[in-house]
Amino acid sequence: MFQYHCLNPIAERGLNMFSEDYTKTENINEADAVLVRSARMHDMELGDSVKAIARAGAGVNNIPVDACAEQGIVVFNTPGANANGVKELVIAGMLLASRDIVGGIEWVAGQKDKENIDKLAEKQKKQFAGCEISGKKLGIIGLGAIGAMVANSATHLGMEVYGYDPYISIDAAWNLSRTIKHSKSLDEIYSQCDYITIHVPLLDSTRKMINKEAFDKMKDGVVLLNFARDLLVDEEALINALESGKVKKYVTDFANPLVAGREGILVTPHLGASTEESEDNCAVMAVKQLMDYLENGNIKNSVNYPNCDAGTCVDEGRLTINHKNIPNMISQFTKVLGDAGVNISNMTNKSKGDLAYTILDVATPISQEVAKNLKAINGVYRVRIVK
């Protein structure tokens, strides 16, 4: 039996994927697995029972990923599950920035008591006029699941699309339209594009990457969109760029006192993945990954440990080891098992940076004593008897 805990509301469609072997607990330190969306976990102390955390979404900056790794806690996310929902909002953001649709709606609402509203509308509509996005140049920084979908949709809307991503995956590249132009530098995006949208994770290297230096390289009257992470844009520099006319509009999904209600800025209340479909997709993907990990020891879409898939165990026993990626670990594991008279029938070992993960299928059941001896090896974070 396994227990799970939800730090945020999780779509029922996902929770219904859990079999009768799973029960929900209100105590996080009784849980084998934790499901989370936006709740901040950095100040939480997690007990030894917690084996995995699944973020129903892509970003994991609300989770202490490195600290979890050292506790042997695998952190999962759900890349691509909410991509279409975010993509649609980005496209909507470009349209809202191109024509004063919001201003027009507000103006009409203010005239609701006037009999001649139709005639007034004809006289006043020119103040809300704008431009079409067809034929304009769109620069996309980051061509992951969301960025690639934005790129393809924008081409269908008649935009000339430039993409920059030095780390693009082969799968993402294959999914891109052939009409998308490959930019070799951010400077090319800045200097060429009428619209720029950001789709990168928040890292030390990307924090405030859109700063004064970047704005200085952009075309006058550029439209900037940020539906990725709030700290990617230096908002003090942004305000100056808006006041100078360098930036025409800034559209963001991240509200704060500096940007809310300011002229030239459109702010939505973190609606990117707030669609029924996105929430369902994220929840289903998160639950499937947790179940496969807890029941089989397999890892898919982890942000700290490597992907590792040994399928379903057909032998007498299976154990998994979360450990440091350092020399001589495997030889120490096999010695402990050999000394206990345990024969290894299959082994899968994968590494990711400083971390590694090993799945061992064995011909005889594993005792708690053997697991204890494996855990005592320097560099081992967690040993789990899966079967």
Predicted segment positions?
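Glycine-rich Rossmann-fold phosphate-binding loop(s) that bind the pyrophosphate
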Residues: 143-144
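Hydrophobic Val/Ile/Leu positions in short beta-strands of Rossmann-like dinucleotide-binding domains
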Residues: 4-6, 140, 321
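N-terminal Rossmann-fold NAD(P) dinucleotide-binding loop
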Residues: 147-148
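An N-terminal-biased, well-structured beta-alpha scaffold segment characteristic
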Residues: 1-78, 211, 223, 234-236, ...
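Phosphate-binding beta-alpha-beta segment of Rossmann-like dinucleotide-binding domains, i.e.
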Residues: 79-137, 171, 301-303
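NAD(P)-dependent dehydrogenase/reductase Rossmann-like domain
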Residues: 250, 263, 271-387
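Oxidoreductase and adenylate-handling cofactor-binding alpha/beta cores
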Residues: 87-106, 152-159, 285-298, 334-338, ...
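Rossmann-like adenosine-cofactor binding region
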Residues: 42-45, 166-259, 274
